[in-house]
Amino acid sequence: MLSRIEQELAQLGITNVKEIVRNPSYEQLFEEEMKPELEGFEKGRLTTSGAVAVDTGIFTGRSPKDKYIVYDETSKDNVWWTSDAVKNDNKPMNQATWQSLKELVTHQLSNKRLFVVDAFCGANKDSRVAVRIVTEVAWQAHFVKNMFVRPSEEELLNFVPDFVVMNGSKVTNPNWKEQGLNSENFVAFNLTEKIQLIGGTWYGGEMKKGLFSLMNYWLPLKGIASMHCSANVGAKGDVAVFFGLSGTGKTTLSTDPKRKLIGDDEHGWDDDGVFNYEGGCYAKTINLSEENEPDIYRAIRRDALLENVVVREDGSVDFADGSKTENTRVSYPIHHIDNIVEPVSKAGHAKKVIFLTADAFGVLPPVSKLTPEQTKYYFLSGFTAKLAGTERGITEPTPTFSACFGAAFLSLHPTKYAEVLVKRMEEAGSQAYLVNTGWNGSGKRISIKDTRGIIDAILDGSIEKAETKELPIFNLAIPTALPNVDPAILDPRDTYADKAQWQTKAEDLAGRFVKNFEKYTTNDEGKALVAAGPKL
């Protein structure tokens, strides 16, 4: 069996492999990570929870400035390329540079003992991608075993990869300046060869999000919605999806003891319903407590993998310590959460679509009900305030507009995702809501208790019975009272000692929305949506 894999690696340019450790068991991975001779970022440290902790060095988040896609016949007309007018992370790379990076990575992985993990991205058999991850680092193999859908023994026998990720985190590119690249580190994709190359960065999320960018390329072209969201399902089969950027509450709010989790970050929506791309969760752990997030806290045990947390002398973890990064993380297989959809992470069509935003300006209401036009407008706007540390160099809250709540991972033009999502919503008769998990005039973050009360009201339908009023400037319909939610917070103006303060901030934020949306007004469809946005 291994000789076949050796041949397949040789075709990629990885030769003279000393040993192939294919799809190692968790037990085997644990032994590998604990080897005393390991050095640097390869080293795992056992914590009192039973989970292993690793460090990823200076890269404690993704490196979007180092992301490139090969510009060729396959990609040139489909990819949403960066431009001077509208910048994004899809930077073009020529064939010669790709070839040189591929040689660097295959040279690095040749003559080594390698971990090869074969897995699936996507829980639906007809749209999933068979992916092979090749790495020399045990914990990276552990990360992808946690995060992707684990094949059965039988599926492994006839496994043919559709896509290969070659992780050469130990190698950097000495010729980056001459090649016109951003730095010696690189995350590059070739849609024709169906390969991702990683060099210089050890951050686990590059492998996870790399595959997400690919699903975001392939699926919408087939009419399947591809979404940066979490999803869960109630006892009656009612499905909800939660869109939101990092740190807005996707994982926390969808992990709900009353509902079964479909997944916490990446989903597709096809003719049968909503399905997870992944086989695990990648949760932020900064300030994690058992009281606030019991399911995630308890998921941190043997087989979970902690990243960049501070481990005390006695092996316990200080979750409040963000000295390495605010973006501390844990990956764990989805079965570490008790309440999940089994055996396959998928369910029916979503009736409730929730857009999560963490508004650092203290302007947006904790919940509002969106019209179909507002749904498109706020989906394309993708507003939040970036929270500390999910990307390198960001520690203060700053406003960000990220199309479709995931611009960093969009391979096609944002309007394509909006079009496919809204079509799915119309067919299913879904309703969208904008939920602010950020701040208000009190200067404090809206409590997780109130936010959970709001989510409950959306999911059990009681929000539909609530009286609403219109918030000026943004023209959003806000409920005047909801069960188990402090009524004093529902209208953000009431949280300010002086309502004129809200007005000033609201005008400022509205102006930012309007300016950001200008990039979508180059066609009639975009122009028509302007009316759904804030009015100055």
From Swiss-Prot:
Co-factor(s): Mn(2+)
Subcellular localization is given as: Cytoplasm
Q: Which residues bind Mn(2+)?
A: 209, 228, 265
Q: Name one GO biological process term.
A: gluconeogenesis
Q: Which sequence ranges form a coiled-coil region, renumbered to this chain?
A: none
Please name the InterPro entries in this protein's record.
Answer: PEP_carboxykinase_ATP (IPR001272), PEP_carboxykinase_C (IPR013035), PEP_carboxykinase_N (IPR008210), PEPCK_ATP_CS (IPR015994)
List the protein's name. Answer: Phosphoenolpyruvate carboxykinase (ATP)
